[in-house]
């Protein structure tokens, strides 16, 4: 796996490419951040499961992608992934300014002082943070 400075953008691109190609699963390099994002995607029902394989530098997170419909009518559950905050331009929001994605259908993944969580959880806890990405 290639080395990248933005592991989140790399993860989102791999998921986007895998869903467009209708792959069953996708592997991304394992970091604390990719594990946390995988956990949130699973909790919110965007992926059916995630697991970690390998050890050390070879460790990777494998996400099992979800689709609705069968055959030619097969549509991915994840319609879009958008990186918001990036290494060159960080985006921070307080709990009142957190984005609502498609009126609550999608989620924003936020990095807070209490860990990685969805915009709904952060709003409920009354905390803001770095808006990592949008998933819908």
UniProtKB/Swiss-Prot annotation:
SUPFAM superfamilies: Ribosomal protein S8. It comes from the Bacteria. The keyword Lipid metabolism does not apply. It holds the Pfam family Ribosomal_S8. One of its GO terms (cellular component) is ribosome. Disulfide bonds: none annotated. One of its GO terms (biological process) is translation. Keywords: Ribonucleoprotein, Ribosomal protein, RNA-binding, rRNA-binding. GO terms for molecular function: rRNA binding; structural constituent of ribosome. Part of the 30S ribosomal subunit. Contacts proteins S5 and S12. HAMAP family: Ribosomal_uS8_B (MF_01302_B). Belongs to the universal ribosomal protein uS8 family. One of the primary rRNA binding proteins, it binds directly to 16S rRNA central domain where it helps coordinate assembly of the platform of the 30S subunit. PANTHER family: 40S RIBOSOMAL PROTEIN S15A. This is Small ribosomal subunit protein uS8. It comes from Synechococcus sp. (strain JA-2-3B'a(2-13)). The lineage of its organism: Bacteria, Bacillati, Cyanobacteriota, Cyanophyceae, Synechococcales.
